[in-house]
């Protein structure tokens, strides 16, 4: 395997937020930012591995503020660790008024990509060695975060969702269109995350009976590719409320429209807050009724505790040389 130069371990995408990027609320937020994150992460992973790559995990996405239409956007993806076939990539989205060029962060998260060959089988990637003490600290944090991620995945996988649950549930259903295709002929991981955000918003706004905005997305696990032309079902269920927050579990399933069989492709936990004049506002409190409700409410609280055990996203990050 040929060596990959250190400069290939990061990439910055730069563009203007266009009117077509607008989401609910009149700004660019949630699902569109997730699409940008996936594209930058893919570019970084493909550049490092020299292979086609697939998204397998996106975690701890913290939406700190929306991006305004017309702002200059920078999406920086940097490699922070490699496994045998996987690449852990830290992605930061920042934006600025073009007249000032003063960037502020809008969101940050960790993504995991796996390099695959022409038959879709995982292939080995070059080992990344931290070039600086700061990079070594990021790698150490990424390794600690990997265990937390495994705990989150295990907890999410153990939960049961049946008709016994009473939390508000909303489902979006549609066909995966040719315009959703990625470089490998499947549906973009970022597109799937946008669908997740949209379904969660419908659920949150319906429960709150008012405005809501995404503040967190986590545990986004991609189990299998989603094919163009498939029937897609995105089901969002309320599983916990805080004073201003709504925790929503989202499952994406897909299948051949000629059959009724649907397979799980993606699972995620989203957190929305209620809004009143663009400020966080109290939301109606959900009270678990069934045993399943109680278990899912406890699960959401457990995930809150797990998220406090990682420090990778709390570190100060220098902006890359532009």
Q: Where are the regions that the model predicts?
A:
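Catalytic strand-loop segment that frames the active site of acyl-thioester-processing enzymes
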Residues: 1-29, 140-195, 203, 208, ...
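Short coil/loop residues immediately preceding or within conserved phosphate-binding loops
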Residues: 12, 58, 171, 212, ...
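Hydrophobic, helix-prone linear segments
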Residues: 1-76, 103, 286-288, 304-306
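Catalytic cores of nucleotide-enabled group-transfer and carboxylate-activating enzymes in metabolic
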Residues: 39, 177, 188, 198, ...
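Active-site helix/loop of acyl-thioester processing domains in fatty-acid/polyketide metabolism
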Residues: 31-51, 190-212
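A cross-kingdom feature marking solvent-exposed beta-strand/loop segments within repeated
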Residues: 55-74, 94-99, 107, 213-224, ...
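HotDog/MaoC-like acyl-thioester-processing domains
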Residues: 2-13, 67-69, 80-150, 228, ...
